[in-house]
Amino acid sequence: IKITKILKQSNFVKREVGYPPFQIILHFVYMLVMNKRQSTFIKNSENAFGKDAYYRFIKESRYNWRKFLILSSAAILQRIKPLHKNGEHRLLIIDDTVEPKRGKFIEGSCKYVWSNKEHKSINALNIVSLNYADSHSTFQVDFSIKMNDSKRKEISEFTSKLHHRSNSYQRKSEIIKSKNTLAIEMLERALNNGVEADYLLVDSWYAKPNFIEKANELGMPVISRLPNNKLIWNFKGKHKTMNAIYESLKNSRHKSSGKYGKISYKYFDAIIEHTILGKIKLVFLHTGKDLLVFISTDIT
């Protein structure tokens, strides 16, 4: 994938002193593949550098890690593109991840971030990630850190010593943006750098008309679960909420049935016109206990 060229494009160039970035990257790849900790690698490998070399490499603010991640992902996708068969879908997935970080002085860490894994609020980093998935592979394309109002440190505390045009400053300054803004910016960067996909999958947090409209303008059909609440959508016609639309259609539509594990369900779809989004497809899936609603801007 011409990794040396990608490193140069991402400003990974050798300085006056130190080791070439390409060699250090290879060491990190080896640690990842062999599942070795850095301390173990340094202790047991004759070719390892001193630990300070790896720490300086990671902390270097001039390296554009985001560009390196996107360009390398796009290059890998081009290599595996011939493996795709007709009918297989390529997906971009926007997801939120909570990474526990207990320290008070960690950049971007926040208090009272809800963790679905631990089922409680914890001190953590709130990470918005853009991932790629198909029938053969899945990997991360981009990510951003979102800082909420319960931040542990002020932004000025870790940007004051950085040049305002540096990659590090720009990256650390974006954490006050909204999740929707971060997600759209990541999607736009990925598409501009040659990442190709058929659909964008998001959770109910991003299932808002303005976000879906912006994704459609970038050429990405959106599939998402909608929150089944009393929220009023600007649908054209008499019925405005999900339950109202479901009740009006459930007796006049042919229902299909299925089973997932021990859960039996019935579902049907309908084409509805929205004031902002135009014609969209809604899929209503009922498990007997819960009603799940999904939206797709691809009505084919």
Feature-to-residue mapping (PLM):
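Conserved aromatic-histidine-acidic binding/catalytic patches
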Residues: 29-33, 42, 118, 171-178, ...
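Hydrophobic, Leu/Ile/Phe/Ala-enriched alpha-helical segments that form helix-helix packing faces
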Residues: 31-32, 45, 76-80, 187-194
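Single, function-defining residue in the core of a domain
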Residues: 1-11, 72, 87-88, 105, ...
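Gly/serine-rich nucleotide phosphate-binding loop at the start of the catalytic core
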Residues: 1-67
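Short, conserved catalytic/metal-binding motifs centered on acidic residues
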Residues: 27, 41-44, 88-102, 130, ...
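Glycine-rich, histidine-containing beta strand-loop boundary motifs that form or position
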Residues: 45, 142-143, 224-226
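Active-site-proximal, Lys/Arg-enriched surface segment
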Residues: 60-150, 264-270
